Amino acid sequence: LLVGSEGTLAIITEITLRLIPKPIENQLLVIEFKTLKTALKSLALISKHGLRPCSAEFIDKQCIAIAKTLKTPFIGIKNITGYLIYFDFDGDSKKNVSTQAIQCIDLIQQYNPLSSQLINTPLEQENWWSFRRSMSTLLKTYAKSKVSHDIVVPISNLPSTMDAIQNLSTKKITVLGYGHLGDGNIHVNVLNINANESDWKIAITNISEKLFRLALDQAGSLTGEHGI
């Protein structure tokens, strides 16, 4: 938040860093949920039980549906119809990370996930992470034009924020989000599906203003990690 604000919130004069050993092993867990609410609540649930994934990502089901219409190499999404959560666990042994991942799977059963996959090999893990990294490009390929925003809100406010973001869509313009569940950073993408240029320019101004007001109302910031 402070780095992204580029000096508008505070000026850092001194930083003390503590180095930790590089993790030896990691285990990626990909979970599919039927509802956005349960997907976004999953991190709070596992955190309450002491699990601390090194990465926690979420992808809206609209993003996945769009990706499936394009010719992509990401075969893992073929049967995905819900919202995706990535949890990546790291540690000093394979047993350690596997134990964390299995405990996570057990905990989230109360939210009735549609599926949960342990992604074991480095090649499979890279395929899933490549899909996540390619999201912006995929959305740009799909839409006539695209505008991206980068808001951040408290993690507890993610469900209500994402609900409001989805409500910004119109018949000709789709608004969706994905991002970092672990810090509340949402990459909001406004997609021109079939609006003409003049309507698009007016709509993007209105939608952006509503989005920025939403971020502030949710105790967040207009800029997450990419600056102003």
Q: Model features per residue range: what roles?
A:
Residues 1-228:
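Noncatalytic alpha-helical scaffold of FAD-dependent oxidoreductases
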